[in-house]
């Protein structure tokens, strides 16, 4: 290992980037796999449509091995980590706007499909950064942090933010919003939070 690589590995503590990297890895997967079903159910979509489309948009995580070998041909792993995080945030913002559209379901599914490709690409790049930036010993040392923050993303998304959508729904309903409008408003706020 050359001196430059060794210095870059020692310059920034893994505790400063491993937790956020794996939290960001877990969030799109959990939102598309679990939270989107609650969102669509609240907005009146049938169970059959929800099951079909949410399972279909999860395919990028299954087939990500197809484009994994080509990522470093174009740019670095770090580039793809940053780019996919920004792209996913922007797309969640678009989804927040899409729930207000007349054909919101089709548009939101389309946006979520792009989030899925972005999230799957982020998974590939994030694992690559983890392996290339950390020594074998450090990889073993921080594997617990990796898993903890990936699972924290699950807890925040499925527990905290789904609860928050329900809390907002109650508030919007209390001020006279119709049921559908109250759900649209509450999910707009939650999807906007996923932007950050």
Task: For every predicted segment, state its role.
Residues 69-74, 96-97, 156-184:
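Transmembrane alpha-helix termini and helix-breaking/packing motifs in multi-pass membrane transporters
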